[in-house]
Amino acid sequence: MANFLKLKQFLTLVLILLALAAKSSKSTPSPSSTTRVKGIYWIENPLFPPSSIDTSLFTHIFYAFVSPNKFTYKLEEEEEDSTTVATSLTTFTNTFKTKTPPIPTLLSIGGATSNSTLFAFIASDPTARATFINSTIQVARTFGFDGIDFDWEFPTTTKEMNDLGELLFQWRRAISDETASTSRPPLLLTAAVYFAVNFFLSGERRMYPVDSINKNLDWVNVMSYDLRGSGSNVTGAPSGMFDSKSNVSVVSGLFSWIRGGVAPEKIVMGMPLYGKSWKLQDPNVHGIGAPNVGPGPGVDGGMAYFQVVDFNKQMGAKVVYDKETGSVYSYSGSTWIGYDDPFTVSVKVGFAQALKLGGYFFWAAGYDTSDWKVSTASKAWRPES
């Protein structure tokens, strides 16, 4: 821990210099609002209803997920005969409207299991695109959401990235037109995006439409996690701040967005409330990069943070803070788990604030401990004058 504390002190000095350099080197105008995003995604879960969320910790809450119909291009919720989905959406928004102050909610469309090919067609076809956009605005307004979040995982070609840029342009125009005709406050428009501004690990090299993002989105939720997955044959930091051997890290990814031209205040850093586990090939070889034979406990090795805490306690696991990656992991026997804890989250939040980013978000509600240990650590974001 002592070495990690030194790392934190070093980071503070370095990040201030980097933040100043980034600010002076970019001409992209920053949003006028000084509000910082402190968000969390909620997944439909009867064991963790929206009312269980500690709203004192968050400024925005996302409903995950809804999807368009592959034949009509309208959100399923607009055509749903059953009242089940409508009740879920209404309960969600009403839960946060009654808070003091009310907490803005966003309807998130897509997700990791959504139909990427369908999104590609919608983005490229003017008729399908208009139908989809109008449906999202209609559903958001009907159920009382304050904004729309788009999670396309992921555009696979340069053309699809260009089409995404046009989709965002038309979406913003439709939101502005709706506001002009109804005198309602404009819906927020955000997008969940890859950890880096460009895709360089596989497939066609392509870059997000930065100009369209700056002009049409309120912010992007950068998924700075899942950097190492169950398919890897060695252990790794799933959301490590650094990687001396590659550009696959939180720091590299966020700086790619800034260097790419996105205004820092439009970049919101994502953090996971879960870890990734592996089964070690040799329990005596247990550092970062140790060979493994496959996923450990959990679905595909995924473990909610509260499950990691329980595992560490029950198994007497050794907890290690790794200064090379700026991450934490634990191991016991053949089980190895990489994750974020309150300390690493406080470091990341300090990093985001030093860079003058737009804020942070967590995936996902219900994964933290019952007393919100990790989420509470995000209070490392200091009040701004």
UniProtKB/Swiss-Prot annotation:
InterPro entries associated with the record: Chitinase_II/V-like_cat (IPR011583), Chitinase_insertion_sf (IPR029070), Glyco_hydro18_cat (IPR001223), Glyco_hydro_18_chit_AS (IPR001579), Glycoside_hydrolase_SF (IPR017853), Glycosyl_Hydrlase_18 (IPR050314)
Gene Ontology molecular function, alphabetical: chitin binding; chitinase activity; hydrolase activity
Record's note on what induces expression: Induced in roots by Nod factors and infection of the microsymbiont Sinorhizobium meliloti.
Location of the GH18 domain: 36-385
Keyword Kinase part of the UniProt annotation: no
Origin: domain of life: Eukaryota
Protein's recorded name: Nod factor hydrolase protein 1
Species for this entry: Medicago truncatula (Barrel medic)
Protein's gene: NFH1
